[in-house]
């Protein structure tokens, strides 16, 4: 994979429900995919009192606690944008990487546009499930993270903590990239 001018940033969010605006983004975790020690995380104040009980249960987060301890969404997005700018040089392109990227990107995109007016990731995201689907030629059913892990054998795991999950996704991304390189050599 060419990475000389592209900085792949693994991003994970935890939310109170399935769509931005009606539901809140509760936390952001991110790391540079090929340098995961370069990382960012924050908790956000809810923008809505709406929630799906199962979404809250899986995160272990509380809207009440986040009203007190979370960052104002403007501050959170400013900090996230500043972090992104700190890991990307002027001649480099930042690429959003996610597992089910369409979900995480929709919240990040919404919050960046509503609170800052633009999204430093632009209009596209690289989806790890789709990347694996293309590399492995597996069925879509076999692109779940638990199924991918059986093949690529990551050392980390996801646990619905946004930063932990971003680091896990970054590891899956690197391992799938390595698998892709191996398949090229096998041809």
Swiss-Prot record:
SMART domains registered for this protein in UniProt: EXOIII
Enzyme class: hydrolase
GO cellular component: cytosol
Start and end residues of each Exonuclease domain: 9-173
Binding site for Mg(2+) 1: 12
Keyword Mitochondrion (UniProt): no
InterPro entries (alphabetical): Exonuclease_RNaseT/DNA_pol3, RNaseH-like_sf, RNaseH_sf
Residues that hold Mg(2+) 2 according to the record: 12, 25, 160, 165
Keywords: Antiviral defense, Exonuclease, Hydrolase, Magnesium, Metal-binding, Nuclease
Biological function: Effector component of a CBASS antivirus system. CBASS (cyclic oligonucleotide-based antiphage signaling system) provides immunity against bacteriophage. The CD-NTase protein synthesizes cyclic nucleotides in response to infection; these serve as specific second messenger signals. The signals activate a diverse range of effectors, leading to bacterial cell death and thus abortive phage infection. A type III CBASS system. A sequence non-specific 3'-5' DNA exonuclease that preferentially degrades ssDNA with 3' overhangs or a mismatch at the 3' end.
Subunit and partners: Homodimer.
Official protein name in the record: 3'-5' DNA exonuclease Cap18
Provenance organism: Escherichia coli
């Amino acid at each position: 994979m060419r990475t000389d001018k592209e900085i792949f940033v693994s991003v994970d969010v935890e939310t109170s429900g399935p769509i931005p605006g009606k539901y809140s983004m509760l936390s952001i975790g991110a790391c540079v995919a090929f340098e995961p020690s370069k990382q960012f995380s924050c908790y956000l104040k809810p923008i809505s009192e709406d929630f799906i009980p199962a979404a809250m249960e899986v995160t272990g987060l509380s809207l009440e606690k986040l009203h007190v301890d979370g960052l104002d969404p403007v501050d959170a997005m400013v900090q996230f944008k500043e972090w992104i700018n700190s890991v990307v040089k002027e001649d480099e392109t930042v690429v959003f990487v996610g597992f089910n990227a369409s979900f995480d990107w929709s919240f990040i995109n919404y919050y960046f546009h509503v609170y800052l007016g633009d999204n430093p990731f632009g209009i596209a995201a690289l989806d790890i499930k789709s990347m694996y689907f293309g590399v492995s030629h597996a069925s879509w059913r076999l692109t779940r993270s638990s199924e991918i892990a059986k093949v690529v054998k990551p050392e980390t795991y996801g646990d619905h903590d946004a930063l932990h999950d971003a680091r896990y996704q970054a590891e899956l991304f690197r391992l799938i990239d390595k698998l892709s390189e191996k398949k090229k050599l096998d041809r």
